[in-house]
């Protein structure tokens, strides 16, 4: 994946094949299955195949691993949304690609990490929360920039309200949508766009 390779080269996320990357990957699986509090450093070390003490060459404390999982997931999401609309000309397609990008964030490779971000938010310190919120605000600002720039063309009356409705509905899809069902992410993005703009679906959007 080009986005991942670029972020690794820029030092914004860990190489999944590196010791640090393997720790993050295995920890995310354990945190998702057992929860942050119930996962021990020994559990993580065993999953990675290293001694417990070796973890501390890469992370000072267990919470730093949790923060890294969340931080790297948000960075991937930011890069993905920016790439999604790059070169897109029409307002409708820009919004559709943003919706599609967010669905990919929820249901794609970053899905587990984004779920951890929500479920384990209270497990990190206030200072770490502030850093993550700064990253998250970057993501949201991009959304609002696209919506505001295209509000007239898309006949959007309230940009803030639309973003909140989209954010809530897209996030909730994690409870009912399955990738192996009858509707793929492209079709789901078409449905969400039609609902957001109160437009009838085009024939090609029908599964």
Indicate where each model-derived feature is located:
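C-terminal peripheral helix-coil segments that are non-catalytic and often amphipathic
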Residues: 1-7, 104-108, 140-149, 160, ...
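Amphipathic alpha-helical segments used for helix-helix packing
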Residues: 94, 107-127, 144, 175
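Amphipathic alpha-helical packing segments from all-alpha helical-bundle domains
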Residues: 75-78, 116, 126-152, 160-164, ...
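Hydrophobic alpha-helical connector segments
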Residues: 68, 82-112, 162
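N-terminal intrinsically disordered/low-complexity leader segments
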Residues: 1-18, 25, 29, 88, ...
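Amphipathic alpha-helical interaction segments
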Residues: 22, 93-97, 101, 116, ...
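Helix-turn-helix
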Residues: 11, 22, 26-64, 68
């Amino acid at each position: 994946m080009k986005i991942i390779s670029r972020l690794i080269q820029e030092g914004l996320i860990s190489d999944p094949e590196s010791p640090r990357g393997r720790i993050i990957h295995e920890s995310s699986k354990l945190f998702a299955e057992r929860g942050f509090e119930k996962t021990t450093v020994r559990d993580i070390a065993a999953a990675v195949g290293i001694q417990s003490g070796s973890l501390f060459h890469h992370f000072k404390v267990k919470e730093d691993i949790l923060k890294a999982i969340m931080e790297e997931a948000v960075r991937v999401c930011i890069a993905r949304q920016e790439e999604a609309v790059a070169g897109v000309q029409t307002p409708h397609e820009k919004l559709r690609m943003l919706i599609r990008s967010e669905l990919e964030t929820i249901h794609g490779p970053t899905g587990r990490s984004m779920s951890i971000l929500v479920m384990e938010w209270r497990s990190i310190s206030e200072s770490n929360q502030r850093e993550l919120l700064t990253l998250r605000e970057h993501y949201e600002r991009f959304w609002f920039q696209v919506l505001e720039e295209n509000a007239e063309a898309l006949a959007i009356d309230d940009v803030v309200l639309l973003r909140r409705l989209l954010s809530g509905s897209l996030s909730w899809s994690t409870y009912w949508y399955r990738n192996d069902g009858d509707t793929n992410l492209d079709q789901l993005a078409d449905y969400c766009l039609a609902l957001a703009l109160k437009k009838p679906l085009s024939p090609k959007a029908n599964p």
